[in-house]
Amino acid sequence: MIGGGAIGLSIAWRAAQAGWSVTVHDPAPASGASWVAGGMLAPLSEGWPGEDAVLQVGAASLARWPDFGAELETLSGETLFTSHGSLTVALDAADAADLRTVAEWIAGQGYELELLSRAQIRAAQPSLAPNIRLALLAATESAVDNRALIAALRSACVAAGVEFVAEAVTDPGALAADQVVVSAGTASARLWPGLPVRPVKGEILRLHRRPGVAPAPTMTIRGSVHGRPVYLVPRGDGLVVGATQHESGEDTQVTVAGVRDLIADAQTLMPSIGEYELHECAAGLRPMSPDNLPIIGRVSDRVVLATGHGRNGVLLTPLTADAVVAELDGAPLAEAKSASPERFTFNDE
């Protein structure tokens, strides 16, 4: 295994359970996008007409999360799930029209979302802004604590006999292994020539609720302010607020402008958020593919790719692990077919 984020650790764990001897190579495990992620499991809320394959892959992974998460919680003692349900809100008529379009499209794909009126929104989430006019409820979605997930996966890997090597790999072909899985996030593009994965920077804030301040929403809240997407994810005694999107190479510095926009946009959705403590600002690099689908599958006799998960790495963790182990066993997973590397043309080994 090359890469020790949520994707790499989940593959290592499942492969070890399947009888493989597994070694994870990563100089700084879980220090990348997995550490900064919001932890949303929200394929329906993030769905958009035309991205049918993205929706289907995400929904297939969401369906695996209850059993996957429960098994990890039992093995590790960590508490993973932080909230259940997602609410996407509309502040103006254009946003409300978009929500209705998405709800209709999602229904056509065989999934159900519920439109909530202004009064229903206020009753369900009283801390939200009173001028929110419509919302889309995805009751089957959840959110997990990404850092607890990393800790749980690490514990599960150790218990399953996975070994760890704190070194970077520059040539997958040089590893003395029967099979090599490349799951190194944005670094994957340096390990396999022509791999169409690019870094997209995302900044997030972690806020703590102070005494006497209105409580956080009980579910993930998503919206758009001045054309910028923003989300609020319940996390312990506070919230995770995210996330900016910038294509700026390998830059992971948090900017003043990014923090300003996140706070302003979050406060538009939840006015009392201005009274929360600003606990942490962080940035990571999403490994994006050209079509927003991950890249999962074999590219040579020895190398399997598991990368390009973009903003959905945590969501797609269980499906990716199952798909890679199936690939290693010579029986590719049908639910991951649309994520095959065969849809791209790039160099092989």
What does each model-identified segment do?
Residues 135-172, 179, 183:
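Helical element adjacent to the flavin cofactor pocket in flavoenzyme catalytic cores
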Residues 2, 176-187, 321:
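Short hydrophobic core segments
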Residues 16-36:
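Glycine-rich FAD pyrophosphate-binding loop
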